[in-house]
Amino acid sequence: MQKRVVILLLDSFGIGASEDAKDFGDLGANTLGNIAKACFNNLADSNDRSGALKLPYLESLGLGLSALKAANELPLGFQSQPNLIGAYAYAQELSSAKDTISGHWEMMGAPVLFEWGYFKDKTHSFPKEILDEIVRKTKIKGYLGNCHASGTEIIKDLGEKHLETLYPIFYTSADSVFQIAAHEERFGLDNLYALCEEAFQILEPLKIARVIARPFIGTNRESFKRTANRKDYAIKPHKKLLFETFIEEKRGEVISIGKIADIYAHVGITQKFKAGSLMELCDVTLEQVKNAKNNSLIFTNFVHFDSDYGHRRDISGYANALEYFDARLKEVLENLRENDLLILCADHGCDPSFKGTDHTREYIPVLFYHKDLQPAFLGKSESFADIGQSIAHFLGLSPLDYGKNLLNFKGQP
């Protein structure tokens, strides 16, 4: 029997502070719950949306009930007895961090049980010897930033100075990351990518998970904006991924949409599709759901929930994007094939109502749909790896080293 798996990952869509949230300073975080509360109280109204958060298709897959189990309260405005068509769980992260790479790697069988390297100082964040080596090896004349910053704010603050000097802007965050912003036209996209590649080679021994190219355009503070040509340079996963097993044992196709390929350092990816906006990500995903051959795994990361709304602490924007996604989810459901398994999940939280601008340590929703899957609560997962293990079971692959299978189809003992 030919099967397909479709994974839709809503980047940063947490559903309540996890049991270890206190260790991360994230007690009280609840991305979905706090967005729903703001919407219900008309605090997230805008020209684009108003009133309670309306996510009927996500609710039908068990989103609200998953959040109820995770946070002990139903998101405001959600139904306590929706017309349930999916099976649902919620998951605690096993990995030692709350970043994109850790969450994604864990769900494909490679939890991060070591400590990433971090740049913890808010100013003068990077060691001088590292900066000196980057300058020496790349022949840039200097750099700006060298601090923790919001990516959109730092190009407003330093973009004009960057255009005067052509010094790249170096910055970081609470994540294990070294980010480089530069003007796409004046500095040059190829030059930015080459700089990031060199910086990645220098930083890899320090276990810095990612170097990210952040190109932008514009002529002044008011017009600067980031482009869709972001590129992530990531450390390769330390364990064999589900993708690789699927290719080796079933000659499967692994189709990356958005930044998935970069997150996994292109390991086990057979096809890659980029997309710039949330609409484009939905369009490309729907196209692949319609056209990808059997024996495929389609995996999309919907980054904008995190980058445009979570980190920016934009509750109304996050709510509007969720409602747009939910409407497009209807199209995905309508185009699934007989033996498709649909999975919706997240990689961490990024509560737009919470203090600061960083990710939040939260439980994630794990929602499944298949025609032969009984709608039911599947319990609490102690690792995101349960997602990968369930996929391995569904596809008839060798089991992963981590995680347990959550799925029991009609007709199975």
Swiss-Prot record:
Its EC number(s): 5.4.2.7
Residues binding Mn(2+) 2, per UniProt: D306, H311, H359
HAMAP family: Phosphopentomut
Reactions catalysed, as given in the entry: 2-deoxy-alpha-D-ribose 1-phosphate = 2-deoxy-D-ribose 5-phosphate; alpha-D-ribose 1-phosphate = D-ribose 5-phosphate
Enzyme kind, highest EC tier: isomerase
Biological role stated in the UniProt entry: Isomerase that catalyzes the conversion of deoxy-ribose 1-phosphate (dRib-1-P) and ribose 1-phosphate (Rib-1-P) to deoxy-ribose 5-phosphate (dRib-5-P) and ribose 5-phosphate (Rib-5-P), respectively.
Record's keyword annotation contains Membrane: no
GO molecular function term, any single one: magnesium ion binding
SUPFAM superfamilies listed in its UniProt record: Alkaline phosphatase-like, DeoB insert domain-like
Source species, domain of life: Bacteria
Entry note: cofactor: Binds 2 manganese ions.
Biological pathway: Carbohydrate degradation; 2-deoxy-D-ribose 1-phosphate degradation; D-glyceraldehyde 3-phosphate and acetaldehyde from 2-deoxy-alpha-D-ribose 1-phosphate: step 1/2
Residues that bind Mn(2+) 1: D11, D347, H348
Main subcellular location: cytoplasm
Identification of the protein by name: Phosphopentomutase
InterPro entries referenced in this protein's UniProt entry, alphabetically: Alkaline_phosphatase_core_sf, DeoB, Metalloenzyme, Phosphopentomutase_DeoB_cap_sf
Gene this protein is translated from: deoB
GO biological process: 2-deoxyribose 1-phosphate catabolic process; 5-phosphoribose 1-diphosphate biosynthetic process; metabolic compound salvage; nucleotide metabolic process
Top-level taxonomy: Bacteria, Pseudomonadati, Campylobacterota, Epsilonproteobacteria, Campylobacterales
GO cellular component: cytosol
Cofactor(s), by name: Mn(2+)
Keyword list, A-Z: Cytoplasm, Isomerase, Manganese, Metal-binding
Localization: Cytoplasm
